[in-house]
């Protein structure tokens, strides 16, 4: 049972509230808490000069600022602390604050707890953003007032009073956001699971445990959607508290969605033919099947079909940029894990020139090398992980007695220049890093946009 938002308003009024992080996503939260009558202090590692005009803007509405290297040392004495998702709750500063009586939470936890609309939550290692967008588009096509947020879209908590019971909310949720959750969306999906974010999580087991929070607190009338082709997610059916639907690319699933004879089918009803889908790759067929399961109770087959046959993809996901001298360029900057890069490679019909490498999330690259060696013509590596990826491929090349030319570069501009010089007519060049961007870029969007700008200047 959802809690009425008036309870939160009564609870937060006059409270001393700390918000950790003054990034773009937290700014609406800070302003909203001030509007609700809280006494807000915002914390950030950046100094005033780096934050720019937002520091003055927040101070003008009565927000106190704690900035600089040791900013978390001053978390004592607060009633409520909103932490940024990527910060572990077992940090000493949070542990100490909790022992002193602070209620530690996050924007997403409070949003799901109080949101009056029906909430669809999507998580997994790969396919989250595309599937979230597909679910959003299908609900919108059916005529629902639909909101999208979480890891994509805009922060939604500040808009919660505009939402009604007959609205729909679609959330992309990361393991960071889920790690401290004690509330679950009514309709939840885990797309697939493979090692990821092991720079933050203690191990893969903790990562999986965090993902499970998306359904751990559901009720008997809620829905969990699982990938039947993924052993880990398929096995979670026994832990479900409500109904379960599954999707599969390899076998018929009568209580769910499946691909058979190139037809995408939902509970025995044909939705569309795979040849009519604009999205590239089998992984995107899986994303569509997952979306069908999520919206099945709320959306007609016609709306599913319309989106499946008209939606051409999300920016930075196997996005075609242009063709230059017979060479096609694709931007797959969202591919921040080996499994996502493998899915991208599998969507092409010939070996490609791959640009990869980036921030080290402490995950293995052996699966990428073993699964992708025959799909790569030339491998161009950059970033913190370049030598780690090179080593993984060299072992597979030696074992398989195959040939892949590997080139190490120091910048995106150099990577594109090398790829352009080495490419022949008919080749495909794709940026699909298999890593996060944080060693060189603030996020994958900026990385992808730089790649596109360089390609468009050729």
Swiss-Prot record:
Binding site for ATP: 124-130
Biological-process GO terms, alphabetical: cell division; cell wall organization; peptidoglycan biosynthetic process; regulation of cell shape
Record keyword Lyase present: no
Catalytic reactions of this protein: UDP-N-acetyl-alpha-D-muramoyl-L-alanine + D-glutamate + ATP = UDP-N-acetyl-alpha-D-muramoyl-L-alanyl-D-glutamate + ADP + phosphate + H(+)
Main location: cytoplasm
Class of this enzyme: ligase
EC number: 6.3.2.9
InterPro entries: Mur-like_cat_sf (IPR036565), Mur_ligase_C (IPR004101), Mur_ligase_C_dom_sf (IPR036615), Mur_ligase_cen (IPR013221), MurD (IPR005762)
Compartments in which it is found: Cytoplasm
Family, similarity comment: Belongs to the MurCDEF family.
NCBIfam families tied to this protein: murD (TIGR01087)
PANTHER family listed in its UniProt record: UDP-N-ACETYLMURAMOYLALANINE--D-GLUTAMATE LIGASE (PTHR43692:SF1)
Biological function: Cell wall formation. Catalyzes the addition of glutamate to the nucleotide precursor UDP-N-acetylmuramoyl-L-alanine (UMA).
Name listed for the protein in its UniProt record: UDP-N-acetylmuramoylalanine--D-glutamate ligase
Native source organism of the sequence: Clostridium botulinum (strain 657 / Type Ba4)
Top-level taxonomy: Bacteria, Bacillati, Bacillota, Clostridia, Eubacteriales
Gene: murD
């Amino acid at each position: 049972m959802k809690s009425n938002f008036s309870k939160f308003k009564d609870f937060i009024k006059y409270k001393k509230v700390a918000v950790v992080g003054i990034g773009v996503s937290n700014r609406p939260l800070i302003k909203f808490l001030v509007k609700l009558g809280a006494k807000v202090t915002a914390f950030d590692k950046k100094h005033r000069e780096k934050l720019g005009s937002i520091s003055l803007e927040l101070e003008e509405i009565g927000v106190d600022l704690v900035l600089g290297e040791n900013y978390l040392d001053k978390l004592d004495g607060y009633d409520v602390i909103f932490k940024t998702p990527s910060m572990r709750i077992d940090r000493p500063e949070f542990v100490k604050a909790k022992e002193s009586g602070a209620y530690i939470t996050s924007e997403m936890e409070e949003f799901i707890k109080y949101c009056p609309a029906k909430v669809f939550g999507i998580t997994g290692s790969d396919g989250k953003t595309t599937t979230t967008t597909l679910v959003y588009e299908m609900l919108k096509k059916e005529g629902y007032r639909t909101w999208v947020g979480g890891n994509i879209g805009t922060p939604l908590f500040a808009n919660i009073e505009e939402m009604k019971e007959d609205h729909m909310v679609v959330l992309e949720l990361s393991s960071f956001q889920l790690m401290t959750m004690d509330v679950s969306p009514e309709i939840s999906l885990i797309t697939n699971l493979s090692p990821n974010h092991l720079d933050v999580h203690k191990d893969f087991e903790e990562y999986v445990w965090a993902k499970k929070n998306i359904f751990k607190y559901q009720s008997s009338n809620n829905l969990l959607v699982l990938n039947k082709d993924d052993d880990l997610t398929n096995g979670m059916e026994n832990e479900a508290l409500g109904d379960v639907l599954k999707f599969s690319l390899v076998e018929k699933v009568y209580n769910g969605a499946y691909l058979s004879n190139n037809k995408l089918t939902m509970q025995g009803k044909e939705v569309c033919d795979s040849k009519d889908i604009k999205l590239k790759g089998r992984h995107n067929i899986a994303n569509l099947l997952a979306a069908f399961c999520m919206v099945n109770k709320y959306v007609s087959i016609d709306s599913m079909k319309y989106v499946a046959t008209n939606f051409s993809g999300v920016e930075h996901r196997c996005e075609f940029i242009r063709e230059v001298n017979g060479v096609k360029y694709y931007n797959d900057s969202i591919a921040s894990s080996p499994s996502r890069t493998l899915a991208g490679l599998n969507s092409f019909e010939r070996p490609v020139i791959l640009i990869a490498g980036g921030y080290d999330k402490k995950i293995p690259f052996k699966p990428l090398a073993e699964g992708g060696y025959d799909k790569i013509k030339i491998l161009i590596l950059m970033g913190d992980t370049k030598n780690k990826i090179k080593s993984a491929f060299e072992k597979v090349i030696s074992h398989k007695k195959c040939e892949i030319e590997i080139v190490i570069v120091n910048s995106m501009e150099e990577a594109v220049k090398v790829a352009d010089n080495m490419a022949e007519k008919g080749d495909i060049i794709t940026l699909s890093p298999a890593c996060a961007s944080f060693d060189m870029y603030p996020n994958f969007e900026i990385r992808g946009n730089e790649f596109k700008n360089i390609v468009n200047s050729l």
